[in-house]
Amino acid sequence: MLKRLKFLARNVNLKDSEKVKEFIASQNYTDGYKDNLIDAYCHFCRFYAIQWVKPKYMREERITKVPKEEDINKIISHAKLKYATAYSVLRDSGMRPVELGMLRVKDFDLETGDVYPTTAKHGAGRVLKLRKATLAMLKQYITDNDLTPMDVLWKTKRVLQNWGRLKVSIAKKLREPHLNQIRLYDLRHFAGSMTYYKTKDIIYTMRFLGHKNIKNTLRYVHLIDFNKDDYHVSVAKTVDDALKLIEQGFEYVKKLME
């Protein structure tokens, strides 16, 4: 939110709500991004008691392909230990990158592999689990750098920047341009989708992702057939649509776009 407010402040007087509205409307952004700017400005207006009529933008449905684990791992395998560990934690846990940046050593149980993140977006608290290989990497990283329980492990901005550079480099090196399309946030999509695929439990998936409202989990529901080499995706706009596709042999998988 702060980043969006700073962007607006560089381009328009935030105390002039009509100018802000005109500026946002004039930009060549998606309605979804414009709506995010509006939401950020609404917080500013409430804080400074500025009266204005909030414009409405209709978010367009956009399908993002869930990356394959083998493609995620291709990128991770070329990262240095610090970042390979960070990416593996995201892949295993489905945390948001911003939540990763708040983790301290004390937030990990180095015996069980349990993780106790601070949930972003006022979400519900949860306990997550790392794979044994990821836990081993984490222990090595902590030992190699003599980290103490209160040390922060990663900075979100640097993790994002490193992922952006790394995927471009690996996509070029392996001559697999589709790797360049995998965003860091897609690791959360992968983890959420696989959690539902394995459990068939939307409530468990909601808690896994740290949502308080199941509507957030169901906001973007995709049905993916994992039995094929390439995922076949069909969008379900209602629960009835979802049930019909399940009857056709699809697996019901949660796919999040936040």
Regions found by a protein language model. Name each.
Residues 70, 93, 102-140:
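Conserved tyrosine-mediated DNA breakage-rejoining catalytic core shared by Y-recombinases
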Residues 18, 22-31, 49-74, 118-121, ...:
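Flexible interdomain linker/hinge and immediately adjacent N-terminus
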Residues 108-110, 200-226:
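Short, polar N-cap/turn motifs at the start of nucleic acid-interacting alpha helices
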Residues 99-100, 182-183, 192-195, 200-211:
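Active-site-proximal segment of tyrosine recombinases
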Residues 129-132, 136, 141, 207, ...:
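DNA/chromatin major-groove-contacting recognition/catalytic segments
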Residues 131-179:
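Active-site/catalytic core of tyrosine-dependent DNA strand-transfer enzymes
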Residues 1-53, 130, 162-166:
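Non-catalytic DNA-binding core/recognition domains of DNA-processing enzymes
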Residues 65-97, 122, 188:
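Basic, Lys/Arg- and aromatic-enriched nucleic-acid-binding interface segment
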